[in-house]
């Protein structure tokens, strides 16, 4: 049995294959997943697992250098936005690097997901609970 944090085989495999600047999406239950993208569906029921639960586990194994977030989260989900920014700040400190945060419209965000290595769907049912993580290097 794997001893590391990520026990889900699909998520572990995707993270291990990421190269510098490759992207990985963690999303809520409602984000449309492009047909061209690998879909890893973690949703069990509404809210389970939450967006933050999935993100926290993914970022224990993924080196992140940038994040893309929909601008709309600021006004439509300010509590999650604050939680997300706190997590990214803590991740920066843990990794010892600066994580660039980019905001874009939700429409452009959805288009950008087509270029990601995979889309990991959580059971989150709150608006704009989505992030595109850009892989960094550990050296």
Curated annotation (Swiss-Prot):
Keyword annotations of the record: Carbohydrate metabolism, Cytoplasm, Isomerase
A biological process term (GO) from this entry: D-ribose catabolic process
MF GO annotations: D-ribose pyranase activity; intramolecular lyase activity; monosaccharide binding
Residues that bind substrate: 28, 106, 128-130
InterPro entries, alphabetized: D-ribose_pyranase (IPR023064), RbsD-like_sf (IPR023750), RbsD_FucU (IPR007721)
Catalytic residue positions: 20
KW Cytoplasm (keyword) present: yes
Protein's pathway: Carbohydrate metabolism; D-ribose degradation; D-ribose 5-phosphate from beta-D-ribopyranose: step 1/2
Group of enzyme by EC: isomerase
Keyword flag Iron: no
A Pfam short name: RbsD_FucU
Localization in the cell: Cytoplasm
Reactions that this protein is recorded to catalyse: beta-D-ribopyranose = beta-D-ribofuranose
One GO term describing the cellular component: cytosol
EC number: 5.4.99.62
Quaternary structure note: Homodecamer.
Family: Belongs to the RbsD / FucU family. RbsD subfamily.
Designated name of the protein: D-ribose pyranase
Lineage of the organism: Bacteria, Pseudomonadati, Pseudomonadota, Gammaproteobacteria, Enterobacterales
């Amino acid at each position: 049995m794997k001893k590391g944090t990520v026990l889900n085989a699909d998520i572990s495999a995707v993270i291990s294959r990421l190269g510098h600047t490759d992207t990985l999406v963690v999303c809520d239950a409602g984000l449309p997943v492009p047909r061209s993208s690998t879909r890893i569906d973690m949703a069990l029921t509404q809210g389970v697992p939450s967006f933050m639960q999935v993100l926290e586990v993914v970022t224990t194994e993924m080196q992140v250098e940038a994040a893309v977030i929909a601008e709309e989260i600021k006004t439509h989900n300010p509590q999650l936005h604050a939680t997300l920014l706190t997590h990214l700040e803590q991740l920066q400190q843990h990794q010892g690097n600066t994580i660039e945060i980019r905001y874009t419209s939700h429409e452009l965000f959805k288009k950008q997901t087509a270029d990601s290595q995979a889309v990991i769907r959580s059971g989150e049912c709150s608006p704009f609970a989505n992030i595109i993580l850009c892989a960094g290097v550990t050296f």
